Regions:
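Active-site activation/catalytic loop segments of kinase-like enzymes and analogous catalytic loops
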Residues: 1-32, 36-56
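Basic, amphipathic N-terminal segments
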Residues: 52, 61, 65-172
């Protein structure tokens, strides 16, 4: 119920879930009372997974932010040394994941011509996997939207379950 509705549990989905299950096997009274608790646990796990993904992406975005900052500062103060910063980044083998690439592209695109060089390097690295910067930026945007919807649905569902009259639920 949690994965199919992306964390959204409402009266209709909850009663449909219970009714569908009971077409196979009738639930005992204790099992009916436990359903809201089990769904709460599943929603909390859904929030944990989304939170862990968001935290991991934040680490990648921070890493990109730091590299972009170094490159922008170097391009402004000592443009000839920019290639050394790019080489340092390349040696650090940054993760070519959507959060890192999207943040680096966001910070560097449209800056100076010199700052197009690290983006060209990333584009080359991504092309080895059949990807582009644009694809990863789009993927990152979609993932952020998915996480936002999942978090919102899960929190709303927890509120719904907190307000649920369990006696009425079990008797229905």
């Amino acid at each position: 119920i949690i994965s199919h509705g992306d964390g959204r549990v409402d009266p209709e989905s909850l009663s449909g879930f219970v009714a569908a299950y009971q077409t196979v096997t009738a639930l005992k009274l204790g099992e009916l009372w436990a359903i809201p608790i089990m769904i709460r646990l599943a929603l909390i796990e859904n929030l944990r997974r989304a939170g862990a993904r968001i935290a991991s992406d934040r680490v990648d975005r921070n890493r990109a932010h730091e590299w972009a900052g170094q490159m922008m500062e170097t391009a402004e103060k000592d443009p000839k040394s920019l290639i050394l910063v790019i080489a340092d980044m390349a040696r650090s083998n940054p993760p070519m994941v959507s959060a890192f690439v999207a943040e680096l592209a966001r910070r560097l695109q449209g800056q100076s011509a010199a700052l197009a060089l690290p983006l060209t390097w990333i584009e080359q690295r991504l092309s080895e996997s059949g990807l582009t910067i644009e694809q990863l930026v789009q993927s990152e945007t979609q993932q952020q939207a998915i996480d936002q919807v999942s978090m919102s649905n899960s929190i709303g569902s927890l509120r719904f379950l907190a307000a649920l009259d369990r006696r009425e639920f079990v008797e229905a």
